[in-house]
């Protein structure tokens, strides 16, 4: 379904080079109309929070936690506080300030964790986040390091089958001028704080290059998946979570020519 957007300050049409498997310029391509949209940081932030909170799992506490005791208050006139105490002892129990007592305000399953957003707003936020990947100022503002002259980086779709090893992928990224961002992510890898280290979140790695490929099982996709901070996603599953980690638009992104066509088809728009 095509949407007509009445918007001001549209960007000019942008022509970017298309690179082959060696990093040389093979052709050029006109970016789809979605790359001409202005960047709405407010919408991108809301859409990110909506998608991020949708993944949260509701949690609660045992209603009887801290209450499995026969402790009762001794009353007044004994020179001690009137908190419930274990029989035969003066140890306090049950109340929230006592050791092993109930929690004062435990998390509840009924709490609404998800932040909702309108479908059209979410769609416009995704288009805006895609447009931000062509803005050099926003990409640098996110902290990405690159020496490419134009953004985004576009690869010919034939590259997917021609590169199958990490060494070849590294050579390609060096040729197009984005491998230094992978090194930035590698140097920024650090231990996570808290008990997440025991729960499968031992390290925290910065986000680096995002690959938007039509085939997530292609040799190129398998070659780059192991690189620090690199993500691979298809045009049909591309979302604000990939394009704007943390709600900050302008991720360093690499598309293929076929992926651009699929994105243009997915976000079919009509400009006035």
Curated annotation (Swiss-Prot):
Keywords: Ribonucleoprotein, Ribosomal protein, RNA-binding, rRNA-binding. Coiled coil: none annotated. One of its GO terms (molecular function) is rRNA binding. InterPro entries: Ribosomal_uL4, Ribosomal_uL4_dom_sf, Ribosomal_uL4_euk/arc_CS, Ribosomal_uL4_euk/arch, Ribosomall_uL4-arc. GO terms for biological process: translation. Part of the 50S ribosomal subunit. This is Large ribosomal subunit protein uL4. The lineage of its organism: Archaea, Thermoproteota, Thermoprotei, Desulfurococcales, Desulfurococcaceae. The gene is rpl4.
């Amino acid at each position: 379904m095509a949407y007509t957007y009445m918007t001001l300050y549209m960007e000019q049409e942008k022509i970017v080079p298309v690179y082959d498997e060696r990093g040389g310029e093979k052709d050029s391509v006109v970016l789809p109309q979605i790359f001409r949209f202005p960047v709405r940081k407010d919408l991108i932030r809301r859409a990110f929070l909506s998608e991020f909170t949708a993944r949260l799992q509701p949690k609660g506490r045992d209603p009887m936690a801290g209450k499995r005791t026969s402790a009762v208050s001794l009353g007044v006139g004994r020179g001690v506080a009137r908190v419930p105490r274990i029989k035969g002892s003066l140890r306090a129990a049950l109340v929230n300030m006592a050791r092993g007592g109930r929690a004062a305000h435990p998390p509840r399953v009924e709490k609404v964790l998800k932040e909702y957003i309108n479908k059209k707003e979410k769609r416009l936020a995704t288009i805006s986040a895609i447009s931000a990947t062509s803005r050099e100022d926003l990409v640098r503002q996110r902290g990405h390091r690159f020496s490419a002259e134009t953004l985004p980086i576009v690869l010919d779709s034939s590259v997917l089958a021609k590169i199958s090893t990490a060494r070849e992928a590294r050579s390609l990224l060096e040729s197009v001028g984005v491998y230094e961002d992978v090194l930035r992510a590698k140097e920024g890898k650090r231990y996570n704080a808290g008990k997440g280290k025991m729960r499968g979140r031992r390290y925290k790695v910065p986000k680096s290059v995002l690959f938007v490929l039509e085939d997530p099982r292609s040799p190129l996709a398998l070659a780059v998946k192991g690189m620090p901070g690199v993500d691979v996603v298809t045009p049909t599953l591309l979302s604000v979570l990939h394009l704007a980690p943390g709600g900050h638009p302008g991720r360093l992104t690499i598309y293929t020519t076929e992926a651009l066509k699929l994105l243009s088809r997915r976000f079919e728009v009509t400009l006035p």
